[in-house]
């Protein structure tokens, strides 16, 4: 079970949001590159970046911070980025910087053809991020809940060639209320590609249940607020997950 630290970028700084609200941002660091190095030194084997300004603006907005992070750690561990990835040109430009994968979120739901085209242009390097409230996909920084069920979308994107799905339960992200294991497993069982859980990890007690879900296709979990606020020691959590595999 891979635990993946999240680095959320807002105006060049590392922050965390509560339930996707930009006005509910807590600043954790003015140096995202130092944050990336810290998590690498704590045993992270992959990093998850989100350009929050990009997610709201529709185009990435934190290029200097992203470049600094890649310069610091990309030679050692893969780095993935989401937020503002809404056309092939942007996706290509950011992959060329040294990112391992790009995550398409809102654009995947609004413009499914983009996913198909991106998978053809950049095979093996496209992840789709599906955010859900009560099983229905949410878009535009969680501002709009659609009529599309995430399982139907996941099956479609699997056929298009995405390498994995990141699944966020909106009701739990940044609220420290536990991962929605049941919903994540249900999604993972509906596809053959790996599903990464995101949102709600609260403590070491969550790790055994996550690891038990691995046999159903849940390959990892993204963690943010818990490791920044100290309710989870990242190194200890990854060691525990490794011991349970």
Curated annotation (Swiss-Prot):
Gene Ontology MF terms: 1-(5-phosphoribosyl)-5-[(5-phosphoribosylamino)methylideneamino]imidazole-4-carboxamide isomerase activity
GO CC terms: cytoplasm
EC number: 5.3.1.16
Top-level taxon of the source organism: Bacteria
Keyword annotations of the record: Amino-acid biosynthesis, Cytoplasm, Histidine biosynthesis, Isomerase
Residues forming the catalytic site: 8 (proton acceptor), 131 (proton donor)
One Pfam family in the UniProt entry: His_biosynth
Localization terms from the record: Cytoplasm
Transmembrane segments: none
InterPro entries according to UniProt: Aldolase_TIM (IPR013785), His_biosynth (IPR006062), HisA_bact_arch (IPR006063), Isoase_HisA-like (IPR044524), Isoase_HisA-like_bact (IPR023016), RibuloseP-bd_barrel (IPR011060)
Gene3D superfamilies associated with the record: Aldolase class I (3.20.20.70)
NCBIfam families: 1-(5-phosphoribosyl)-5-[(5-phosphoribosylamino)methylideneamino]imidazole-4-carboxamide isomerase (TIGR00007)
Protein name: 1-(5-phosphoribosyl)-5-[(5-phosphoribosylamino)methylideneamino] imidazole-4-carboxamide isomerase
Organism classification: Bacteria, Pseudomonadati, Pseudomonadota, Betaproteobacteria, Neisseriales
